[in-house]
C-alpha cells in the first residue's frame, strides 16, 4: 500500500490510502453526495466497472455540491465513512476524501484536474446519472470536463437521456444498466419516520446510520 498522496498546484487536495501504487489504466470516477450510499449506487458501480472494462473505480463523496441544498446533507466525514464501509470488502473499489478536504464548493472540473495530475497516464471515466446530463451545461467549465474525462451516463427512472440537447453528444458514453429505483432521499425519510431500510443499504451502513443517529431530527 502507499500512504495518502498530497499534491499542490492551483488546487489543493489529498487522497486516502490507495490499494495499489500503480496507476490504473482505466479509472472510473463516481462522485456524489452519497447521503447515504445505497444498494443502487453499488449496482451501478459494478455495471460500469464491467461494461467499461475499468481497472479501478474511485468513489468521491462531495463536501459541498454546488447543485444541491446543503441543509439536509450529513457531515462529509459521515458520508465518507459510510462509503468506506459499503465497499471495504471489494478490491475493485476505493474511496477518496479529495473533495472533503478541499475548501469551497465541490466542482467536477477541479476534481478531474486533480486526478489528472495524479494519474496522468490513466484514462478517466466520470460517471453521472441521466438527470445530471440534462443540466451539465450549467456546470463550471463543462468543455474542460469533457477534455479531462469520458462522461459515462447511466439511466435514471423516468429520465430519457437520449433527448438531452447537449453539444458534447459524441463525447458521451451511454451505458445501459438496471434502473434501480432507490433514492437517498427516500432512505432519509424512512429513517426519520422510524421505518426499516434493510436491503436498501448495506448492513454496515444501516448500522452506522443507527449508531450515529443520522437522519433523525437533530442528527448530523
Language-model segments: which ranges?
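Nucleotidyltransferase catalytic core that binds NTPs
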Residues: 8, 13-220
Amino acid at each position: 500500500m502507499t500512504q495518502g498522496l498530497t499534491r499542490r498546484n492551483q488546487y489543493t487536495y489529498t487522497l486516502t490510502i490507495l490499494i495499489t501504487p500503480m496507476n490504473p489504466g482505466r479509472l472510473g470516477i463516481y462522485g456524489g453526495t452519497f447521503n447515504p450510499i445505497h444498494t443502487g449506487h453499488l449496482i451501478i458501480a459494478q455495471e460500469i466497472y464491467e461494461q467499461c472494462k475499468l481497472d479501478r473505480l474511485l468513489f468521491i463523496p462531495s463536501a459541498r455540491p454546488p447543485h444541491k441544498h446543503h441543509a439536509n446533507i450529513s457531515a462529509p466525514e459521515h458520508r465518507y465513512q459510510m462509503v468506506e464501509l459499503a465497499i471495504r470488502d471489494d478490491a475493485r473499489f476505493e474511496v477518496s476524501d479529495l473533495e472533503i478536504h478541499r475548501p469551497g464548493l465541490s466542482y467536477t472540473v477541479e476534481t478531474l484536474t486533480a486526478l489528472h495530475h495524479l494519474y496522468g497516464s490513466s484514462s478517466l471515466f466520470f460517471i453521472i446519472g441521466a438527470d445530471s446530463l440534462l443540466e451539465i451545461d450549467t456546470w463550471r467549465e463543462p468543455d474542460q470536463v469533457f477534455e479531462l474525462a469520458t462522461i459515462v451516463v447511466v439511466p435514471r427512472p423516468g429520465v430519457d437521456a437520449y433527448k438531452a440537447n447537449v453539444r458534447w453528444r459524441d463525447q458521451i458514453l451511454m451505458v445501459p444498466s438496471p434502473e434501480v429505483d432507490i433514492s437517498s432521499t427516500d432512505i432519509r425519510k424512512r429513517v426519520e419516520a422510524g421505518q426499516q431500510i434493510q436491503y436498501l443499504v448495506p448492513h454496515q451502513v444501516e448500522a452506522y446510520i443507527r449508531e450515529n443517529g443520522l437522519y433523525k431530527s437533530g442528527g448530523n
